[in-house]
Amino acid sequence: MQIFKPASGHTHSTVQKSVVNKLNFYYGGYQALKNIDMMVYEKQVTALIGPSGCGKSTFLRCFNRMHDLYPRNHYEGEIILHPDNANILSPEVDPIEVRMRISMVFQKPNPFPKSIFENVAYGLRIRGVKRRSILEERVENALRNAALWEEVKDRLGDLAFNLSGGQQQRLCIARALATDPEILLFDEPTSALDPIATASIEELISDLRNKVTILIVTHNMQQAARVSDYTAYMYMGELIEFGATDTIFIKPKNKQTEDYITGRFG
Amino acid sequence: MPIPNNTDHSPGSLRRSYKRYLKERVIELLLFLAAFLSVFITFAIIYLLISESLVFFEHVSVWDFLTDTQWTPLFDDAHYGILPLVSGTAISSLVALVIALPFGTIIAIYLSEFAPFTVREIAKPFLELLGGIPTVVYGYFALLFVTPLLQTILPDLPGFSLLSAGLVMGIMIIPYVSSMTEDAMRSVPMHLREGSYAIGATRFQTAIKVVMPASLSGIAAAYILGISRAVGETMVVAIAAGMQPNLVWNPMEPAATITTYIVQVSLGDLPHGSVGYQTIFAAGLTLLLLTLVFNILGHLLRKRYREVY
């Protein structure tokens, strides 16, 4: 049994970026999320933890309406996005607009069959940016923010598949950053990577927390403790406990949360 | 507790079983023969075409064959220029591909990226039905329906034309192109599409900018297959394009293709061994080389744009 050292040395913000109100989600007839209430604070890292099948990825994917891509999925409740104070789950909201502002990085690195440059420029190009000078500037910025610029600056024309797994994942982060999203969603971003690449991605997430609001799903509790400011523990589609990461990891209120964090189950 | 005695087996239990070994070898041999047979037949056809063509080229120089602009092997004033047949083949194929490739691709994009499950399940069998119609039916469809229809727009169109044959051939090839293209696009993993959607791309942008480049090798294979079919198609052009070997580049004229010429001579009463009869082997060899070029091209494309996910 081990108590993990929580992330420290950076200020907790209490500015609300997003508020989740009574969120229910259904895959056809199956209810995957039950009555979830949660806060997402601006420029903070919020980790979603819990055993497999608890609904943490499902919850994350609600934030950029990824469930709209498949038939018979159905949301109830609200995810309010500030400063608009609008419910992004409302049928009047265009999921494409939501995804323009809330971007996502996936479990498995998924670069497109294009050059490194075109991968990062993709989000800008689909928004109609054509000026070469603007593209070059934004691509360089995104690659710098993703800590990849130094490694690829001399081979921006190479196919993205030629990069290593960790580099591909940082490229996907650069791709998501290029369009200046307000919230960045990470769905187990290191589960397909080796320990060294994992460390570099975690470091990157720590660096990014001052620039963008981050939500991260992780199986790895040490990772949640290391990178996050807030932690939500989920079980069977419900949010069991939510609070500052220090509190959740050192003195959780709920017995179930404590059991999971200390490795007694899950 | 007694320690189990490991040496207490009947001796020789580890020895190779000859019965099993023999059975495996027989199966291996049968599989090899099946594979060998198809390769053997291919080479036999190539051997036949080349050896018979050599007889033809003893009478006609390769230079004349490739440059003469007339193809009249059955006339008293015989000319043996393959160009008129090649032009007929090229024009009818071109017309067919102008129809089949864009429509096939559009249908594939719709079915793979846009169509709801039920629509796809209903539409695919119908498309495959289109591919199952005998080509002779397409030929008469071209001659008796499409040509008169075209004549209302183009009054100068003759009763036999490459245009009409090519159009119908294009319709005929659409299912081949669309079904192979769709398979290639559907095999692109979902997580690649999600990566595109997740940063705000529309379905169309995702289809054009991510899914199509990712499945390029499969799409290239589909196009090559379409081209090969158009070049090798016989019945539709034989019925609807006329059989006069004309060196034309205008689709609104009647002309013969390589395949229709071979049919014409095979069904005729030319004596075997005459130069006139040998022409069909030279024509067949030309056709084989043409399709070979496309297959090699397809192979190179596949290697160039190999899928890596």
Curated annotation (Swiss-Prot), chain A:
Subcellular location: Cell inner membrane
UniProt domain ABC transporter: residue ranges: 15-261
Pfam families noted in UniProt: ABC_tran
Reaction catalysed by this enzyme: phosphate(out) + ATP + H2O = ADP + 2 phosphate(in) + H(+)
InterPro entries, per database record: AAA+_ATPase, ABC_transporter-like_ATP-bd, ABC_transporter-like_CS, P-loop_NTPase, PstB-like
GO molecular function, one term: ATPase-coupled phosphate ion transmembrane transporter activity
The organism of origin for this protein: Nitrosomonas europaea (strain ATCC 19718 / CIP 103999 / KCTC 2705 / NBRC 14298)
Gene3D superfamilies reported for this sequence: P-loop containing nucleotide triphosphate hydrolases
Annotated PANTHER family: ABC TRANSPORTER I FAMILY MEMBER 17
Topology of this chain in the membrane: Peripheral membrane protein
Annotated family: Belongs to the ABC transporter superfamily. Phosphate importer (TC 3.A.1.7) family.
Record note on quaternary structure: The complex is composed of two ATP-binding proteins (PstB), two transmembrane proteins (PstC and PstA) and a solute-binding protein (PstS).
Protein name per Swiss-Prot or TrEMBL: Phosphate import ATP-binding protein PstB
Top EC class for this record: translocase
UniProt keywords, alphabetically: ATP-binding, Cell inner membrane, Cell membrane, Membrane, Nucleotide-binding, Phosphate transport, Translocase, Transport
Primary localisation category: membrane
EC number, UniProt record: 7.3.2.1
